[in-house]
Amino acid sequence: METIAALTRTENMRNLLLGISALVIVGFSSSSGFALDPMGPPTAGLEQGQFRAGVDYSYSKMDLELTDGTYVEYLDGILFDSGEATSFALKDFKASKAYVNLGYGFADNCEGFLRVGGTKGEFDDSIWVDSEQFDSGNDLAVGGGLKATFFEEGDLKLGVLVQGSWAEHQGQLDSPNWTGPDFVDIDMVEVQMAAGASYTWEGIISVYGGPFFHFVSGDLEDTVGASVTGLGELLNSEYDWEIEEDSTFGGYIGAQLEVAEGCSFNVEYQFTAAANAFGASILWRF
């Protein structure tokens, strides 16, 4: 009877987690906010020599500081003017990412992983404040990281992780008030470092989370569409800013479900003062 009751509790917890995950996915998919990467448990989950493959997805938005800006103007192809561009905050940069995740257990308490996938970004009315909109195409994103467990007692694990990624967003910035679009190229490098805990029930369901550090660096280039002066001359302008995130510290919480032998699904929420994100993964160990 105790075994049946335990199995019933486990099945109920499994159904509850799946239901919560579905609600979270629907909620984020219908919200206005969309570029943090999913982290998963901050502890190693592979044995030595074991492999893992799967899919990661994240949907996030953040505020970015554009600083140390410069501009160059050309008149009929000849240098006309140059100088410093105004620094400002680019609000609600939205990005969705999808990765193929490949992992390997270097030891029972240490694993590494690589990610390759695509990303899509957008923002509204932030550079020129003239009802402009930016929408990138589907661009390349790559990343990788390490996880290590440094304490394990029963179902409780403590560990650390570090991961990084690079993504590019290229597309047009356009406004109904302009005669033609600008062309924007964004390169971003993100680093996340976390320390936290993972606790497992019945060997099937676990919760995890902890504090993390988030660092963003990169640059944004805006090539302004050519315009013709009153004298019939062609004016081209190029702007360039360095990118930083407003906030660097935050926290995250998630849950992981063993949906089948060797297959797990996890869902998580990350937040800082300037960013928030939803992440989900489905992974197979072999």
Task: Say what each PLM segment does.
Residues 59-97, 126-138:
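Surface-exposed strand-loop-strand hairpins of Gram-negative outer-membrane beta-barrel proteins
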Residues 92, 154, 243-247, 266-281:
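Solvent-exposed loop/turn segments connecting transmembrane beta-strands
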Residues 55, 100-104, 114, 144-148, ...:
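Residues on the lipid-exposed face of transmembrane beta-strands in outer-membrane beta-barrel proteins
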Residues 27-75:
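Outer-membrane beta-barrel biogenesis signature
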Residues 57-63, 116-122, 148-150, 162-172, ...:
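Transmembrane beta-strands of outer-membrane beta-barrel pores
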Residues 64-72, 122-131, 170-180, 219-228, ...:
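Outer-membrane beta-barrel translocator domains and adjoining extracellular loop/strand segments
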Residues 109-112, 153-158, 204-207, 257-267:
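Repeated loop/turn-to-beta-strand initiation elements of outer-membrane beta-barrel proteins
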Residues 49, 94-98, 136-142, 185-191, ...:
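Residues that define the transmembrane beta-barrel architecture of outer-membrane proteins
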